[in-house]
Each structure stands twice: as structure tokens, then as C-alpha cells.
């Protein structure tokens, strides 16, 4: 690690803290690369595509998952030297909390919009968050080297949809490096310098922006200093958890780690303090000095709440301990991922895991399979329901299989979301039908040029399954979708169980709306009929709500031709053999076990993907 001794902190007027706000694929990480390259943050040989996307899966999917940060030194055209702190934020809705706390560490944002595609749903969501944080915005139109780029039309669209002046938007191509110096000048002259009420003399007050686990150094914490000075050897206290630590190392990321002696007001850097687990460092928490604490914590801290739950089971039961260890390691880096042990009659031992959303679930599952070489089965994702019992008590339900007796439940409430969908108007009809089929309530519909923006209130339960895939296929991939939780509402929900040969299969039970139960049940039974191999006896597959069977399919039995050895002759002889076979089948049905192959589970859980 390079050693760089800086005893004096940078003056506030020469610091700029900014983030880049954009929809997925609009060129945010590429722009970050160019800024690093232009200011000489890394030598040419150390540059790689998407420097700040460290995880293999981030580069492969072209998305940013963890917020990253980098400190750049820039000499402006006016001869002054500035320190620019860039925080690269995720663009996806599941990581909205990572975005919100990254934004709260900055005073300004670059709004990056693709000059050929224009404003998308997540651009809106993230811009509104930036505006809520009182950010100054500099609009940047990227990809202007594309033949399809229409900068003037997109400027109008930005003014119409977002309502900010885009006449002075900086036109760039992050890929070729065109216009990057203009972006740096705009950052220096248009974005404000950080403010510090108390300056260096005040008690230490710092925002915990992010934390990650380093195998050699333990937990590393990214901090933004608001007041006071953070130095090596200080004893600090986390105001949210009241834990105390001694600072061992203070540094900045350029994106390489560089040690410094202290961090002053307005600066962003990292510290290590022999913290054992990432869970001990709550993102958004306030850090202060133990001996001379600040009077009040920073506002807006909230622990990340899991929204979607699903069971993860190893295909091979022998991998259970490996899975437990792998999840523990992932949790070190991702405090919003939670898990607890559960066992299922059908799938054996596994874990019930909580995620921020479906992309988060997919990424965790993919990282477990790829980085730790595990084969996993994921059960159907479910959301958190709130139950009011007849005795007045409240409880949360994470797993439909654990639903108490209906008689004891007074009310079931499910989470609802507010979804914003942007789509070319050719596909609007299909999208409105999809939302209506999913019990959506339309609240707004506006047109901007040839694009429509529609706002719906939807039950999250209807979205977690395959809503996003269906939306993409209806709109040929052109629609974009963003949502945030609105709250809980009472719903007419019932638990649907699937019985195979009279035995309930716990991994396939789900909570559905009463109106959709019959169709869902019939689909599931038909799907299982195709997937479960024939046995020597006939197998009924039923979908039931309580004691009422709402759908049924029967898998016919495999039959051995027992009458083959009777040549012609006596009909009673054949009858006797057939009756004997029937007896055997009856006994088999009573005691026979139906083997449900793993593939059947996996396929049945992907219901509705067609």
C-alpha cells in the first residue's frame, strides 16, 4: 500500500463531493473510468474497463452493485488545485438504500442520460433522491457519438419530465473521451463546496457511507467527515450501535488505498479499526469521538429491511455446511442480506434468506454458485406479510408454509408498491393489461413525445414472481421499471397447498389472492403432471385451500400386461389376474412413496415464465 503523508487537510472551498446518477447502461461506470484516467488517478497500465466495478459479476452484467468511491486531484483551467471525491452509485432499484446514503455524502450529482435513449424510470427515481438531498445537478448527455443520438430532443425531454434546465448540458462520449475536460470544469464551477458548521475544531461527526470486508485488514469503513478531524489512534464510537473502536489506519482511495494522517471536514476516506463484522457497521450511522462526542447524530439513518424472502437449499445435502460458511462470508460484505436455518420435508436442510429485491436475490444466488461452487435450489420467492390474530396480537409471516390456522387470523396485510413504468407507446396496451391482471391500480398516465410514463400501485406479491420478465417480453426490452414500497394493505389472501398423492409438499405452498387461486392452482397441477414421472400406481396432484380442493390432475399408472400369458381361453382367468393387479396397485397407492425429482421442483417454481 502506497504511503502518502498529508498533515494538512484540504480547504473546504477546494473540495467537491459528487456522485453520478444514471439508469442502468447509460455509461456511468465508463464515465467514472474516463474521469480517473484524465486526472491521472491510475497509471495507464493499471486502468481496466470499469475500474470501480470490482466484482466479476458486476463487470459481467454491466451493473454496479456496491457503491464505490475514488479521490481525484484536478488542476482546473484557473490554475487552482481541487480534490474531487466521486462516489459511484448502483442504478438498480434493489440497491436504492446504497444510492440514498451515497447521495447524502455528496453535495452535487452528475445526471448522465443516454443521448439516444433519453430519460428512463430509474433515472427519475435517482434524480428525485438527489433533489431530496438538495443536490446541485450538472446534466451530462452521453453517447453523442452514436448515429441515433438526438441531444436536442433529449434536452427537451429532461426539461419536460424532470423539470430541470438542460440548456447547458455537457455533451460527451465517455467511450471515446470526448468532452471529459468540460465535465471536470463543470464539476468545479457548478457544484457547491461542502459546508461544515463547526470546522476542524468541532467534535468529530462523520457519516458511515459504506463498509466492506478485506481478508487482510478486516472490515473497512468508508466515511464522509462532516465536522472535526479523524486521525489515526483516535477512539471512535458508532452512535447507532454504541460500539467503540480504536482507529488503526486512515486513508483515501485513488482507487488504490493510500494512507493519510488525518481526514478533515468535507473529505471522504476509509478507516480500519479491527472491526470483526460488517454487521457491526450500520450504513448511514454517525461516527463520533468517544471522549468528545457530537451533540446529535445525523438524520436519515435506517437499517435496510429485507423485502423478499426465499429458501435456498443445497442440491446435495452434504454441501449444507459449505453453504452456511459461504453465506457467512457474503454477509460480511452485504449487511442487507439476512438468513436463518430452515428444514423442508421435500428439500432437506437449507436457509430462509431475506433480500432487498429480486435482482439482489439473483445476484446472491449467482455469487454463491459461482464464487463458492455450490449447486442450489431456490424456492418460490415470497414477501413479508403482516398478520393480525383474533386475540389482537400482531406477527410477521416470512414463509407461507408457516401460516397459522385460518380460524386464528383476523386480517392479512400484504406490501404494496408504487411502480413507475416508462415505455414506447406502441407497447402501452399490453403493459396496462399486465398490470391489471396483477391487481394493479393505475394512478397516472402521461406522454412525453413517443414515450408513455405510467404509474401503478401493485401488490408486491404479484411482482416478485415474474413481472419484470413479462414486462420486458411484452415491450421487446424497451420498457423500464422502478418501484418503491408504499406500505401494507389488507387483502383477501389464502394459502394454497399442493398435495401429491395426498401428501402436502411444503416447498410449493404459497399465499395467493382468492380470485387468482384457481388459475394458479390449475397451472401448478398441470405443470407437475408433466414433470413427475409415472409410477406403478396412479398419483393424484391437487391444489387445495384449507380442506377444499380447487384443482386436480391425475398421473396414470404404469401397467404391466398381466394377461399376456393367457392364450385365448377363459375370460374368468384374465379377470382374476386383473383383479389381483388392481389389489396390488391399491396397496401400493396406500404405502407407495412418490419421488418428486429436483427438476420438477425447479421447473414448478419457475411457474408463469412462458
From Swiss-Prot:
**UniProt KW keywords:** Cell inner membrane, Cell membrane, GTP-binding, Hydrolase, Membrane, Nucleotide-binding, Protein biosynthesis
Which reaction is the catalytic activity of this chain?
GTP + H2O = GDP + phosphate + H(+)
| SMART domains per UniProt | EFG_C
Where, by residue number, does GTP bind?
25-30, 142-145
Q: Which CDD domains match?
A: EF4_II, EF4_III, LepA, lepA_C
Tell where it localizes: Cell inner membrane
> Which GO biological process categories is it annotated with?
positive regulation of translation
Under Pfam families, the record lists: EFG_C, GTP_EFTU, GTP_EFTU_D2, LepA_C
Membrane topology, as annotated: Peripheral membrane protein
Show where the tr-type G domain sits. Answer: 13-195
Which top EC class applies here?
A: hydrolase
A single GO cellular-component term on record? plasma membrane
| GO MF assignments | GTP binding; GTPase activity; guanosine tetraphosphate binding; ribosome binding; translation elongation factor activity
What is the E.C. number? 3.6.5.n1
Describe its function: Required for accurate and efficient protein synthesis under certain stress conditions. May act as a fidelity factor of the translation reaction, by catalyzing a one-codon backward translocation of tRNAs on improperly translocated ribosomes. Back-translocation proceeds from a post-translocation (POST) complex to a pre-translocation (PRE) complex, thus giving elongation factor G a second chance to translocate the tRNAs correctly. Binds to ribosomes in a GTP-dependent manner.
Give the protein family: Belongs to the TRAFAC class translation factor GTPase superfamily. Classic translation factor GTPase family. LepA subfamily.
Kindly give the HAMAP family that the UniProt entry links to this protein: LepA
Recorded protein name is: Elongation factor 4
| Species whose genome carries this gene | Rhizobium etli (strain ATCC 51251 / DSM 11541 / JCM 21823 / NBRC 15573 / CFN 42)
Amino acid at each position: 500500500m502506497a504511503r502518502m503523508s498529508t498533515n494538512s487537510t484540504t480547504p473546504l472551498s477546494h473540495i467537491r463531493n459528487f456522485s453520478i446518477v444514471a439508469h442502468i447502461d447509460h455509461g456511468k461506470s465508463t464515465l467514472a473510468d474516463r474521469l480517473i484516467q484524465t486526472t491521472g488517478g491510475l497509471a495507464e497500465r493499471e486502468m481496466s474497463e470499469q475500474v470501480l466495478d470490482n466484482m466479476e459479476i458486476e463487470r459481467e452484467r454491466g451493473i454496479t452493485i456496491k457503491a464505490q468511491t475514488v479521490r481525484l486531484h484536478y488542476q482546473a483551467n484557473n490554475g487552482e488545485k481541487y480534490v474531487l471525491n466521486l462516489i459511484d452509485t448502483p442504478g438498480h432499484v434493489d440497491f436504492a438504500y446504497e444510492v440514498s446514503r451515497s447521495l447524502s455524502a455528496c453535495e452535487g450529482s452528475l445526471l448522465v442520460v443516454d443521448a439516444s435513449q433519453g430519460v428512463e424510470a430509474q433515472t427519475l427515481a435517482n434524480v428525485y433522491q438527489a433533489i431530496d438531498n438538495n443536490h446541485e445537478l450538472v446534466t451530462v448527455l452521453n453517447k453523442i457519438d452514436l448515429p441515433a443520438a438526438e441531444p436536442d430532443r433529449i434536452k427537451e425531454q429532461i426539461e419536460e419530465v424532470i423539470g430541470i434546465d438542460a440548456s447547458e448540458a455537457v455533451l460527451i462520449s465517455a467511450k471515446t473521451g470526448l468532452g471529459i475536460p468540460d465535465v471536470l470544469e463543470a464539476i468545479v464551477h457548478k457544484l457547491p463546496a461542502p459546508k461544515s458548521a463547526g470546522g476542524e475544531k468541532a467534535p468529530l461527526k462523520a457519516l458511515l457511507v459504506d463498509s466492506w470486508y478485506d481478508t487482510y485488514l478486516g472490515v473497512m469503513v468508508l466515511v464522509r467527515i462532516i465536522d472535526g478531524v479523524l486521525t489515526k489512534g483516535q477512539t471512535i464510537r458508532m452512535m447507532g450501535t454504541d460500539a467503540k473502536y480504536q482507529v488503526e489506519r486512515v486513508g483515501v482511495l485513488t482507487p488504490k488505498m493510500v494512507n493519510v494522517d488525518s481526514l478533515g471536514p468535507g473529505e471522504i476516506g476509509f478507516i480500519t479499526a479491527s472491526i470483526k463484522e460488517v454487521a457491526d457497521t450500520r450504513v448511514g450511522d454517525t461516527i463520533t469521538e468517544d471522549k468528545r462526542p457530537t451533540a446529535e447524530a445525523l438524520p436519515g439513518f435506517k437499517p435496510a429491511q429485507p423485502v423478499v424472502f426465499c429458501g435456498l437449499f443445497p442440491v446435495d445435502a452434504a454441501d449444507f455446511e459449505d453453504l452456511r460458511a459461504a453465506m457467512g462470508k457474503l454477509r460480511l460484505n452485504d449487511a442487507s442480506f439476512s438468513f436463518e436455518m430452515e428444514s423442508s420435508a421435500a428439500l432437506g436442510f437449507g436457509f430462509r434468506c431475506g433480500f432487498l429485491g429480486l435482482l439482489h436475490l439473483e445476484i446472491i444466488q449467482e455469487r454463491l454458485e459461482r464464487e463458492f461452487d455450490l449447486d442450489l435450489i431456490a424456492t418460490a420467492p415470497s414477501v413479508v406479510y403482516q398478520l393480525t390474530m383474533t386475540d389482537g396480537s400482531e406477527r410477521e409471516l416470512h414463509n407461507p408454509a408457516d401460516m397459522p390456522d385460518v380460524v386464528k387470523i383476523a386480517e392479512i396485510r400484504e406490501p404494496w408498491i408504487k411502480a413507475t413504468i416508462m415505455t414506447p407507446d406502441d407497447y402501452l396496451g399490453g403493459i396496462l393489461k399486465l398490470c391489471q391482471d396483477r391487481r394493479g391500480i393505475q394512478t397516472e398516465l402521461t406522454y412525453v413525445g413517443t414515450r408513455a410514463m405510467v404509474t401503478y400501485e401493485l401488490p408486491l406479491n404479484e411482482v416478485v414472481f415474474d413481472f419484470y420478465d413479462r414486462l420486458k417480453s411484452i415491450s421487446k426490452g424497451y420498457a423500464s421499471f422502478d418501484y418503491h414500497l408504499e406500505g401494507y394493505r389488507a387483502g383477501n389472501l389464502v394459502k394454497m397447498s399442493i398435495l401429491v398423492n395426498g401428501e402436502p409438499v411444503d416447498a410449493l405452498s404459497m399465499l395467493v389472492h382468492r380470485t387468482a387461486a384457481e388459475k394458479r392452482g390449475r397451472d401448478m397441477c398441470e405443470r407437475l403432471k408433466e414433470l413427475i414421472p409415472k409410477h406403478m400406481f396412479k398419483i393424484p396432484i391437487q391444489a387445495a385451500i384449507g380442506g377444499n380442493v380447487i384443482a386436480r390432475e391425475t398421473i396414470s399408472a404404469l401397467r404391466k400386461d398381466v394377461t399376456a400369458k393367457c392364450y385365448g381361453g377363459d375370460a374368468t382367468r384374465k379377470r382374476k389376474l386383473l383383479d389381483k393387479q388392481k389389489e396390488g396397485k391399491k396397496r401400493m397407492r396406500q404405502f407407495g412413496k412418490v419421488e418428486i425429482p429436483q427438476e420438477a421442483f425447479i421447473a414448478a417454481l419457475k411457474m408463469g415464465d412462458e
